Amino acid sequence: MKCFFPVLSCLAVLGVVSAQRQVTVQEGPLYRTEGSHITIWCNVSGYQGPSEQNFQWSIYLPSSPEREVQIVSTMDSSFPYAIYTQRVRGGKIFIERVQGNSTLLHITDLQARDAGEYECHTPSTDKQYFGSYSAKMNLVVIPDSLQTTAMPQTLHRVEQDPLELTCEVASETIQHSHLSVAWLRQKVGEKPVEVISLSRDFMLHSSSEYAQRQSLGEVRLDKLGRTTFRLTIFHLQPSDQGEFYCEAAEWIQDPDGSWYAMTRKRSEGAVVNVQPTDKEFTVRLETEKRLHTVGEPVEFRCILEAQNVPDRYFAVSWAFNSSLIATMGPNAVPVLNSEFAHREARGQLKVAKESDSVFVLKIYHLRQEDSGKYNCRVTEREKTVTGEFIDKESKRPKNIPIIVLPLKSSISVEVASNASVILEGEDLRFSCSVRTAGRPQGRFSVIWQLVDRQNRRSNIMWLDRDGTVQPGSSYWERSSFGGVQMEQVQPNSFSLGIFNSRKEDEGQYECHVTEWVRAVDGEWQIVGERRASTPISITALEMGFAVTAISRTPGVTYSDSFDLQCIIKPHYPAWVPVSVTWRFQPVGTVEFHDLVTFTRDGGVQWGDRSSSFRTRTAIEKAESSNNVRLSISRASDTEAGKYQCVAELWRKNYNNTWTRLAERTSNLLEIRVLQPVTKLQVSKSKRTLTLVENKPIQLNCSVKSQTSQNSHFAVLWYVHKPSDADGKLILKTTHNSAFEYGTYAEEEGLRARLQFERHVSGGLFSLTVQRAEVSDSGSYYCHVEEWLLSPNYAWYKLAEEVSGRTEVTVKQPDSRLRLSQAQGNLSVLETRQVQLECVVLNRTSITSQLMVEWFVWKPNHPERETVARLSRDATFHYGEQAAKNNLKGRLHLESPSPGVYRLFIQNVAVQDSGTYSCHVEEWLPSPSGMWYKRAEDTAGQTALTVMRPDASLQVDTVVPNATVSEKAAFQLDCSIVSRSSQDSRFAVAWYSLRTKAGGKRSSPGLEEQEEEREEEEEEDDDDDDDPTERTALLSVGPDAVFGPEGSPWEGRLRFQRLSPVLYRLTVLQASPQDTGNYSCHVEEWLPSPQKEWYRLTEEESAPIGIRVLDTSPTLQSIICSNDALFYFVFFYPFPIFGILIITILLVRFKSRNSSKNSDGKNGVPLLWIKEPHLNYSPTCLEPPVLSIHPGAID
C-alpha cells in the first residue's frame, strides 16, 4: 500500500499520454499466508465514458489454468460462481473503490484454495476497442508457520525491582522472509504500549513512554539462540504494571520492492503487579443537588484517591441514615439489603463500580421517605497467600443530606415570538416554555390558539399528553403542506411555526398548557393549567409598493459603462418575491420592448430583441433588497434610448402556487451615448526636400497625440502639383491596415515604387517613394483619420486632421558629358583604310548609355550628312551618306575600351573626302525604367582627303617603219613601257593617220570608201583645224570588249595580246590603200573602291609608217579575189559530179535486183555511198581536189 498511490498516479499519467485503455494490476507473484487478509489493487486509465468504471475479478486455479472462475464484480451481484458466492455475501470477499478508476480486492480470510492467477477486467465503455481491458497477477498461499509462545504467569513486584520475560518465536516458511519481534504492555481499558521492538531490518525501537529508559539501558531486548527473545526492565515503576506479551510478524518482500507482513502472532501475557511504596488513600462523596421533588432521580458518587488503585483491593459500603444500603467487595459485585434489593430489582435503584476509583449509588425515582443522610465507606483489603482477603484501613467522607418534597403543580407558562410586527410572507415562530418549581411530575398537553381582531378564537394546533400533534380545522390544509408546524423541543418547551404568513394571520397567539400526572391507580389526572399569549401585527406586502428608476450617468461616452438602478420601495427583504423587468426604447423608435427580466425565483430571462445586450450587460439584485441594478458596459449607439423598469410583487401560497399582488412602472430614463472627445494632433511642421532622381523620397506623418491607446489610423497620402487645383490621392491605408492605391498612383505608375511603413512607436507613419522621378516633384502631405472600435465591434471615424506639407523637388543629375575636341587632318590614297576616333572624356553616370553618331561635311555641301550611328543599345546603323557612297560594306566599328569608339572606313574613295566629326548623346534611365536624353556633345573635326594614285603611263614611242608587199600582212605593235598601278587595265585603239590636203589616195576597189572619207573630212573641216585625219582601225576597251572594225580593214584585222603590256594588231591582205601612218592610243583605267573603273590617264604612241607595194592582177588573183567566182569555179562542180555518179550507181543496182526477182529481199547489201572527201587549199592558191578514197563505197 505504500507504493500504491504513486504507482496509481504514474499509471494515470501514462493513460492520458497513451490515449488508450490500459488496465494495470498489482505486480505478482504475491506470497500470503493462510488466514491472512490480503488486498490487491487494480486501476484503469486512458478510457472513454463515465469517470467511475466497473471492475470484475476472476481466478484461474492451478488445477485448471484455462478455466475462468468468477469471484466478485462491482456491477453484478450474481457474478460470483457458487464456490465464492457465500464468502462474497458474507463480506469476506469484497471490492473497495478507492477512486472512480481504482479499486482494491479484499480477501479477509485467505484459504489455500485461493491460490492461482487473478484477473482484473474492466467492461468497455469506449466507443471502440482500443487498448487492454484486463490484467493478471499470481497469488501463492503458503501455510502460516509462525509460532509465538511465552509462559502465562502473574508476577508481583515491588517498585524498583527488576523484571525479565522470555518469548519463543519460530517460523518454517520456505520463502525468504524476515521476522520482527515486539514486547508490549497493556492495561485494562487502555491501548497497548510498545515497550521495545526489533524490526525486520534488525533495528531496535521503543515507544515514547520507554524511549528514554531504553536509551539509558534500563530496558533491553536480547536474542538468546535462534528463537528466544528476552525482555529486561531493570527498575520497575508503578506505571509498568500491566500485562506484558510479545508480538511477532513475518515479513516478505513483494515484487514492487515493498515489505508486507504476511502474519502476526502474539503470545500469552504475563501479568505484572508493581506495588508502590505509598499506601495512603482518601475518600470523598459528591452529588449535584440536595433538594428534590418526588419522582426525581439522584446520584451519589464515592471517589477513591490513591496510588496504584488497579493493583490494590478495596471494598465499598453505602449507608442511608446510618442504615446499610449495599456493600461491594473487590470483585465489584454489589450486595443490597432486602428493602433496597426490591427497588433495585424494579430498576429504581442501582449500585455500581464506574471505574477503579469511582463507585456510584443512583436512585431513579425518589420518594418522600428518601429524605435523609447518605454516606459511603471504603475499606482496603489485602489478599493472603491462601487467596482470602483481610481488612486493613477504612475511611468514609462526610454525610450528604437531601430533602424530597411532595408533588404539586408549580408550572408557569411564557410565550415568546420571533417578532411582534412582521411583513406578510415572513415566518412566525412561537415558543411556549413551561417552568416548574421542581422536577416535572407528569406530562403536558398544549393547545395553540389565535384570537383575531374580532375576538374570534380558533385552534391552530394541539399536542396531547401522549405526544400526538393535530391541526385545527381551519389550519388542516396549510398543515398538510407544511405551512403550520408544532413541535415539542424539550420536555417543557413547545414551539409553533407559521410559515409564509398572510395578512389574516394577524392577531393574539395564545399557548394553553395542561399538566397531567398518573394517579396510584394508573389513571391520568390534571394537576393544573396555565396560558400565555403574545400579539402579532402583519404588514401587507403591497402597502407602499413603488418603483423608481435612477441613473447617475445619463450621458456616457463610447465604451464607457453606465448603471441603471431600479429601486423598490419599501425596502423588502431578499426573500420577498419581486420580479423586475427592464424595458428599452431605442432612439428613433416609439415602442418599448422587454430587455431583461429578473424573475421572482432569481432567474434571468432575456427578451427576444436583447441579443446585442447579453454579452455586455450584467444584472444584479441586491442581497438585502429587491433593488435591481442593470450594468451595461462598452456603451454604444445601440444602447442609447429610454429605459424603464417594471416591478411585480408576488406571494407564494402554502400550496406552492403564486399570486401577483401588485405591479408598478417606474419613470423613464433617457441615456445618451456620445462619441469621445478627440485628442488627435498631427504634426504641422513644413519641410523642403531636394534630391536627385532615382533616390527615395522619405515622407513622414507623425501623430503627436491620440484619443485612445486603442486608436487605429487611416492615413491618406496626397500630392499637390502647381498645375492642379487640389491634391491627388497617392495611397490610402485604412484603419485595418488594408492598402488602397489612389488614382494618381495608378495613372503615374507609382504602385511598384511605393512603400508604406508604420513604426513600432505606433504614431509615426512613413511613405517612401522609391526611385524618384522628376515628375514626382510636388507638395506632399498626409490626411490622418482616427478610428475607434465601437462597443459593437464596428469601427467608426472619430476625427481627421491634415499634416504640414513637404515640398519635394526631384531634379535630374548634372550633366558631365565631355568629348575630346582634338582637330585633325588626314590624307590617304584610295583603297586604304581610315580610322576615325571618338573619345568620351567624362560622362554623367556610369549607368548611362551613349548614342554615338558620325557625320561628314562634303565640299560644296553646307549641310552635314550622317555616316553611321551606334545606338545606345549597341546597334549599328548606316546613315544616308553611307547609302550614297556605298559605304555599307566598308564601315567597321570598334570600342577597345569604355568611352573610346573607332570608326574604320575601308577601301576609301575620293568621294569619301570631307570633314568628319562625332556627336554623342548620353541617355539615363528614369526611375520608371524609361530612358531619356540627359546630355549631348560634339567632338573635334577631322578633315579627310582621299587621293588617287599619280599617273605614270608611258607608251613606247620608238617604233620602226615597215614596207610590205601587196597581199601580205603587217603588224602594228603597241608597247606600254610603264603603268601607274599593277591593278590598272588598258584600253587600246589603233588609228590610221593621213594628211587632209593632198593626202588623197586611191586604191583599187576602194573608191567608195575614199569618197565616204572625203565627205566626212569635209563635214569636219569647220570644227577641226588639225591637218591629220584619224581613222580608227580597231579599239579594245579595258573590259576586253572589241569595238567595230574600220570599214577599209573589216575582216582583215587580227588582235593579239602578247603580254599585259604588249598589244599587237595584224592587218592581213595589205593593199596599196593601206599605205600610211599608224599609231596606238592607250587609256589606263583603275578600279575605284566601289569596284567601278575610271580612266586615270591616256597616252598615244608615235606614228608608224607602213608602205604596201602594188603588183599587177592574175587569173588566180582575180578568182581568189572574188568569192563568188571562187566558189563557182572550184566548189560547185564537184558536188554536182558526185551526185551524178551516185545516181548512175543506184539505177544500176536497182536493175540487177529486178532481174533477180527482188535481190534486195534476199539480203544482198545495197550500195552505200558516203560523202566524198573534198580537199582544198585554204590559201585558195590550188584548186580543190575531189577524191574518193578506198572504202568510201561499200
UniProtKB/Swiss-Prot annotation:
Keyword check for Cell membrane: no
Membrane spanning stretches: 1125-1145
Stored SUPFAM superfamilies: Immunoglobulin
Stretches in topological domain Extracellular: 20-1124
Gene3D superfamilies the record matches: Immunoglobulins
Cytoplasmic compartment spans: 1146-1194
Record CDD domains: IgV
Membrane topology: Single-pass type I membrane protein
Region (Disordered): 997-1033
SMART domains linked to this entry: IG, IGc2, IGv
Pfam families, A to Z: V-set
A GO CC term attached to the entry: cell surface
Principal location listed in the UniProt entry: membrane
Glycosylation sites: N43, N418, N655, N842, N1077
Record-level GO BP terms: lacrimal gland development
Keyword list, A-Z: Chromosomal rearrangement, Disulfide bond, Glycoprotein, Immunoglobulin domain, Membrane, Repeat, Signal, Transmembrane, Transmembrane helix
InterPro entries listed in its UniProt record: Ig-like_dom (IPR007110), Ig-like_dom_sf (IPR036179), Ig-like_fold (IPR013783), Ig_sub (IPR003599), Ig_sub2 (IPR003598), Ig_V-set (IPR013106), IgSF_V-set/TM_domain (IPR051102)
Domain (Ig-like C2-type): residue spans on this chain: 20-138, 143-262, 276-386, 401-539, 545-661, 676-803, 813-945, 949-1097
Name under which the protein is recorded: Immunoglobulin superfamily member 3
Source organism of this protein record: Homo sapiens (Human)
